[in-house]
Every structure is written in structure tokens, then in C-alpha cells.
Amino acid sequence: MHRLTPFVALLLTAQVLAACVAQGARPLPQGAFRAKDAQIYSSAVLDPARLVGRWKQVAGFGPPGACKPGGVEITRGAGGLRAVWRLCLGGQEARGSAPMQPAGPGRFDVAGQAWWVLWADGDYRTLAIGTPDGGFGFVLDRSGGISGDRLRAAREILAWNGYDLNRFVSY
């Protein structure tokens, strides 16, 4: 029977641990800003009526300086909520106008994309919005002058929902 020397046993243990760490890492898919297998939760207590108004983009994901922050105007009409936006999403400017079709608590289908409100502060001054596929995420604020504590809270919520904060950009 063969006996392992302490050095060989240590070497094998290090290799096993390295393999476990490598398997536990979740690389983000190309162009996505969150791990696809991470949990994501929308705000179950969101009051959609309180979303109406003008919002300024104060943060998002993508390369710094790739585009300028934008905003969203949400209106209420006979058909429900409607969004008109110009946003920096993933480092590219996106513009559009579409109904915000309810798709569950805190969840909307906007122009064929899932916009999930992950968090709104208690006074509806700040929103963290994400999408299950991780293609974008952004933070909106009514004033544009977001406080440090609300920005920190939005970052924490995005991280908790699997977003890669190394790619987070504050404007």
C-alpha cells in the first residue's frame, strides 16, 4: 500500500480546493451584467401609481463614459402606465416609448423587455430597475441629485440580485 507524504497530501488538497473554487465562480455571459443563475426579486409592495412623473438616470451598468445618462417619463393614461425614455443601457443610448404592461408585482413588460422594479425607497424618490436576463440595470431618481444613502441602498439591492458591481457606473 502506498502512503502519501505530508507534502503530497498538501499538494493534492490544494488542487482539490482550487478545483472547487473554479467551479463555484459564475462568469457573466457576454453583454450581461448579472449572473443568470442568481436569484432576482421584484418589489412585491410596489404601488405603480407612484411611479408617475419624471425620473433622471443616476447610475447604470457598462463602460464609464460610453454614453450620457438619460431619464424616463412615466405617465398614466386610459390604457395604464406609459414610459418614454432615453437611457444609457449597457454603454449604449436607448430611446423609446411604450406602454408598461403589468407582468406581476413590481414587474413590467416595456417594449418586449422585462423591467423589474427591484427596489423603491419609501418615498418613491429612487428606483433600482433590473431585468432577469441581466442585459441592463439602472437607477432612477426624481431629482437627479441622489443622496449617498439611497445610492448605496440601490447598489446593495442590485448586488443582492446578482448584478456585478464592478461594472456599475454612477453619473
Q: PLM features: what roles do these ranges have?
A:
Residues 12:
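Flanking scaffold residues of small Cys/His-coordinated metal-binding clusters
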